[in-house]
UniProtKB/Swiss-Prot annotation:
Transmembrane segments: 3-23, 64-84, 133-153, 179-199, 255-275, 281-301, 375-395, 418-438, 497-517, 535-555
Domain of life of the source: Bacteria
Task performed by this protein: Part of the high-affinity ATP-driven potassium transport (or Kdp) system, which catalyzes the hydrolysis of ATP coupled with the electrogenic transport of potassium into the cytoplasm. This subunit binds the periplasmic potassium ions and delivers the ions to the membrane domain of KdpB through an intramembrane tunnel.
GO cellular component: plasma membrane
InterPro entries recorded: KdpA
Main localization, broad class: membrane
Subcellular localization, as worded in the UniProt entry: Cell inner membrane
Membrane topology: Multi-pass membrane protein
UniProt GO molecular function: P-type potassium transmembrane transporter activity; potassium ion binding
Keywords attached to this entry: Cell inner membrane, Cell membrane, Ion transport, Membrane, Potassium, Potassium transport, Transmembrane, Transmembrane helix, Transport
Entry similarity comment: Belongs to the KdpA family.
Protein name: Potassium-transporting ATPase potassium-binding subunit
Organism this protein belongs to: Bacteroides fragilis (strain ATCC 25285 / DSM 2151 / CCUG 4856 / JCM 11019 / LMG 10263 / NCTC 9343 / Onslow / VPI 2553 / EN-2)
Amino acid sequence: MNTEILGVAVQIVLMVVLAYPLGRYIARVYKGEKTWSDFMAPIERVIYKICGINPQEEMNWKQFLKALLILNAFWFVWGMVLLVSQGWLPLNPDGNGAQTPDQAFNTCISFMVNCNLQHYSGESGLTYFTQLFVIMLFQFITAATGMAAMAGVMKSMAAKSTQTIGNFWHFLVISCTRILLPLSLVVGFILILQGTPMGFDGRMQLTTLEGQEQMVSQGPTAAIVPIKQLGTNGGGYFGVNSSHPLENPTYLTNMVECWSILIIPMAMVLALGFYTNRRKLGYSIFGVMLFAYLAGVFINVGQEMGGNPRISEMGIAQDHGAMEGKEVRLGAGATALWSVTTTVTSNGSVNGMHDSTMPLSGMVEMLNMQINTWFGGVGVGWLNYYTFIIMAVFISGLMVGRTPEFLGKKVEAREMKIATFVALLHPFVILVFTAISSYVYTHHPDFVESEGGWLNNLGFHGLSEQLYEYTSSAANNGSGFEGLGDNTYFWNWTCGIVLILSRFIPIVGQVAIAGLLAQKKFIPESAGTLKTDTVTFAVMTFAVIFIVAALSFFPVHALSTIAEHLSL
């Protein structure tokens, strides 16, 4: 047990320590300063020339968003065409068939918005061709899209007054070539050394220790897993994700993959401070996020390593904790750490089954996604926190009788309305769709039965499974309580709608706020200015997040995870 706790502590320390130099590097990349990765410049120029991009052309916030949305619309069509025709495409040695239109819609939307919700199993639901030219391609593009959006916001924050926020295409390309690709190559090399497969052969036929014949899938796993983790994507190459011994063979690969989930989101927060020359602001935001993350780790590690009281009542020893749904080679501690790490970000990959975690652990996992502000996805995670900063500035200004200002710009009714709409959209979408699914399940049992029955667990946990699915979709996470039978018309279409609403409306709102503030006249700091880089303001922001985001979900948790915990 002590060894497991030590492993958890080492991973967290590595994340925090290495996030600092990476944050400095990311800030320099987006500022256009000289870095070791300048050798990528000729490749970038070729990309710009082929695509007809002028990287020096500045965009206002409307042009920036237009480019972002056009890019996503194009790749959606690309993905749909390939997924519904993959059975006839090359690199398909196992003869996997095409996806149905509803499943392809859900898959394509899910990976296009960086969620990676999977209503299929990777070994049989995709081919090597679509794994590479849809899934892996989208995992680079969507991660870079979020990073580009944050780069534009950082540029607007650093300027005293400007009409432009940078070039979306330029930020997108350098996010791939100078940040995501180099890190992916390093992680991929480690995975190959540890035994993760990398090739294009079909299934292997093996004889197990019991003498049974078994077919084992392989493929270009080591190429896809690194960006799956680093881009906070999370879509597993195999159906059970990083629980699979070929996707995550050893404790070392588990540490590397878990580290990969959080390193860029952490670094992006620190990059904000370096880019804007306001390090104290970056540190204060980082501190709030780290506090919330560590609180979740403390709860989940304690819950999972403490075991299940129902099993203890039967007189069965649980020296290794609550091991249901966990890999013996990894242990309860490492699985608990991963469960928090993957949900404070929009990653969603798993190394154990969240459906089998203790009720309070499941509540923490869901709350991380429902708050959707602690580190979050690469780039987009900080933008969600930015929304609450605007709200906290406005509320604090009203409380002390000062004009609300953020970084020398007045925060007025227009910005506050957008921020409020974005903040309330998240709980609204989750709770409304959960209510709809619960209503359909209760009042239309024939329809539900025609789709396989949906729930493998009734009662409190059945509600948790439905709530988790929509929470994961809205938070662009992609993990799930897998007791839910989700590859149906109802879940494919409704989750797809939630994915679209919860990805693009917040990004549009957040970039719009940044663009509107950037255009305003800069007001120098004075004795009456509300400082936003202090511990007091950090606590105020945390309080606003807790009240607006967390408490919105208390009633539904009282009916699901909390009720289940009290029933043990």
